Amino acid sequence: MANNFKNAFATSVSTTSGSPTDVYTSNNGSACNSILIELDVANTGTSAVQVTVLIRDSSANAAFHIVKNAPVPVGSALKVVSGQKVVLNGNDKIQVYASAATVDVVASILQDVT
């Protein structure tokens, strides 16, 4: 089976912890997973921001922090996941919110892993 790589993007992310921006939702299927390979956040604004990245586990109906309130200076980016891998089961989500909406997110994902 060929590898199925995908990039997921978000811009102007949520500023509310109660309704974070969904960057990616893993494929639904008991035999399929996705692997988060890299996740970068960039501050596109004129002030420093704090960024929170979560994995929402659909089976537990709970969210778990990858990073919480990480500072990202003006004109900078933060490599949240780089090198290590995070397995996402069916319907798990990558979610992001920040102290200002001036954040872009890029995620690189390997889909349909059995």
Kindly give the residue locations of the regions a language model identified:
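C-terminal interaction-tip segments
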Residues: 1-33, 38, 97-114
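A generic structural signal for short beta-strands and their flanking turns/coil linkers
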Residues: 33-37, 49, 68, 90-92, ...
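Short solvent-exposed strand-capping/beta-turn motif centered on an Asx-Ser/Thr pair
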Residues: 41-46, 99
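Short active-site-adjacent structural elements
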Residues: 49-50, 62
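Hydrophobic beta-strand residues in large extracellular and virion-surface proteins
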Residues: 51-53, 94-96
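Beta-strand signatures of extracellular beta-sandwich domains
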Residues: 52-56, 106-108
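Short edge-strand/loop segments of extracellular domains
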Residues: 56-60, 114
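Intrinsically disordered, low-complexity Pro/Gly/Ser/Thr-rich segments with frequent PxxP/GP/PP motifs
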Residues: 59-93
